[in-house]
Amino acid sequence: MPCVQAQYSPSPPGSTYATQTYGSEYTTEIMNPDYTKLTMDLGSTGIMATATTSLPSFSTFMEGYPSSCELKPSCLYQMPPSGPRPLIKMEEGREHGYHHHHHHHHHHHHHQQQQPSIPPPSGPEDEVLPSTSMYFKQSPPSTPTTPGFPPQAGALWDDELPSAPGCIAPGPLLDPQMKAVPPMAAAARFPIFFKPSPPHPPAPSPAGGHHLGYDPTAAAALSLPLGAAAAAGSQAAALEGHPYGLPLAKRTATLTFPPLGLTASPTASSLLGESPSLPSPPNRSSSSGEGTCAVCGDNAACQHYGVRTCEGCKGFFKRTVQKNAKYVCLANKNCPVDKRRRNRCQYCRFQKCLSVGMVKEVVRTDSLKGRRGRLPSKPKSPLQQEPSQPSPPSPPICMMNALVRALTDATPRDLDYSRYCPTDQATAGTDAEHVQQFYNLLTASIDVSRSWAEKIPGFTDLPKEDQTLLIESAFLELFVLRLSIRSNTAEDKFVFCNGLVLHRLQCLRGFGEWLDSIKDFSLNLQSLNLDIQALACLSALSMITERHGLKEPKRVEELCTKITSSLKDHQRKGQALEPSEPKVLRALVELRKICTQGLQRIFYLKLEDLVPPPSVIDKLFLDTLPF
């Protein structure tokens, strides 16, 4: 910490009044172990001058001094901030003089502890400056600081200083034995302070990052620590006879400084032209307002085609729709799609775009050039519509989006290969175990079908009896259709609704010949190249159709018409990869034939009676019999 140091010799008789009066009080305080330990010696060669023009002459402070002066240049001194800090050295005859400051203000004593002889004053017009107005200014943030020394706020020394009758006797500053510094031209026009160190490289700053300065307004707030105002009044008369005639009765407040702190003072920062707090640079890793892409997980700033996606997935989806591109998955149609692997399988990436809800109808085509696509507004709920007006039918695009979301939600997210075995060991186990596995797979499919049907718009508006009848009548058709869509039958891999992956050999003993019919239907269905919209409509139409025993068949027929209209509208707008309506109708006919074979398989297992069927399967089997 840079500072000005001086050692004092025994005081002359004329300057020891404060020693005689307050010596006993401040001797015990200054020797208290709580005082800061500092080492200061101007004679050391380790102290070096860093500036020669930033301080005014010390002769400004020595006007009227009755001793001889020896000239020394004013400079800044720097000393290492580390090392042991012994107590302030007190020499005989001086240890009781000029220690009227608080123990945090020892820098004033350390700056003036050298003891050369002082020549007479350099000029009659020089004035004595009170040392109590010196304070510490905070360094700029680039200078490393010692745990906080908040500076005292005050104005700079910009005007000529008048005599301060209310200030305290400066003590050792007026020692006749002290050497004076030659005056400078404009010394009285500038404040006494240490200029801030350059930011690069950081150098130790005085007093833990603060600078010594003079503030004439601070003298009005500082005085000797007399302990009480009454003591000052009784001793004012005695001090009138002091050689320097500085009365003490006008200031009764004790001279105290705030304790050291770690935080920088905003007042000092404003004096140095700094902002109270320096804002930290923005963090580029996480920008506010950004989310993650619903397709690959990359950063996404806004929504594209109805879903928050990144620019890469937005462009991929747009190009695929505009060019009617056809993709083929080389794996099992469940490739991982993330930021690193999103370009590996275009088929799975496009299917995931559709599954998260990206709407192809919003993509501009040749008929919509120059216009920005807009998502259709959501239809008003029945409570928001006027009761006198009939509720208009839902727009086809809303029905299509709901069907796609329902189908994707029913698709298992993770595949379970724990039981997959393509070797001859797949046939291990008893016949009863394979039959029980067959029943378990059918039961799991029924639960998935119920949750999927509730997401179809208008299905929950039907009577409960009709809802149950439709689900139970179509449970085998839904089981076969989902199994055909998910499975990679070309490699004999069958993916069931719970994510379980089994080889054909593992299913053959439970499914029998019905498994081969399912495989053929799956190959034919995949050869049709139906998009996910057509598959969603195919799944809905396989359940929502005319059934014997419906209470309100008219409403079921209306719902079926809405689904068919959505499929036609999807094809009419040119968004379908190929005309899908006739293909869907042919697939429905073939699907119902295969379900008849499934009923025959269940009937055969009941007759075999290896394992009793679950009650839900038994009930569904009896309800779906045509006779």
From Swiss-Prot:
The record's note on what follows loss of this gene reads: Nr4a3 homozygous knockout mice are viable and normal in appearance; however, abnormal hyperactive and partial bidirectional circling behavior is observed by 3 weeks of age in 15% of these mice. The circling behavior is interspersed with noncircling periods of feeding, grooming, and sleep. A small percentage of adult Nr4a3 homozygotes displayes brief freezing spells with tonic posturing that are exacerbated with handling. The overall food consumption of Nr4a3 homozygous knockout mice is higher.
Kindly list the ranges of residues that form NR C4-type zinc fingers according to the record: 293-313, 329-353
What ranges does the record list as Low complexity composition bias?
A: 269-288, 378-388
Q: What is the induction note for this entry?
A: Induced by inflammatory stimuli. Up-regulated by the anorexigenic signal leptin via the transcription factor cyclic AMP response element-binding protein (CREB). Suppressed by orexigenic signal glucocorticoid that mobilizes NR3C1 to inhibit NR4A3 expression by antagonizing the action of CREB.
A Pfam family for this UniProt protein?
Hormone_recep
Query: Which residue intervals make up region (Disordered)?
Result: 96-162, 268-289, 365-395
Gene3D superfamilies noted in UniProt: Erythroid Transcription Factor GATA-1, subunit A, Retinoid X Receptor
User: Segment Required for DNA-PK heterotrimer: which positions?
Assistant: 1-139
Keyword Iron set for record: no
Q: Which UniProt keywords apply?
A: DNA-binding, Metal-binding, Nucleus, Receptor, Transcription, Transcription regulation, Zinc, Zinc-finger
* Biased composition annotated in UniProt, kind: Basic residues: 97-112
User: One GO BP annotation here?
Assistant: neuron apoptotic process
| Pro residues: bias regions | 141-150
Entry's PANTHER family? NUCLEAR HORMONE RECEPTOR, NUCLEAR RECEPTOR SUBFAMILY 4 GROUP A MEMBER 3
Which family does the record assign?
Belongs to the nuclear hormone receptor family. NR4 subfamily.
The record describes its quaternary structure and partners as: Interacts with SIX3 (via homeobox); differentially regulates the transcriptional activities of NR4A3. Interacts with NCOA2; potentiates the activity of the NR4A3. Interacts with NCOA1, NCOA3, MED1 and KAT2B. Interacts with EP300 and NCOA2; mediates the recruitment of MED1 in the coactivator complex. Interacts with the constituents of DNA-PK heterotrimer PRKDC, XRCC6 and XRCC5; phosphorylates and prevents NR4A3 ubiquitinylation and degradation.
Protein name as it appears in the record: Nuclear receptor subfamily 4 group A member 3
Q: Which organism is it from?
A: Mus musculus
The beginning of the lineage is: Eukaryota, Metazoa, Chordata, Craniata, Vertebrata
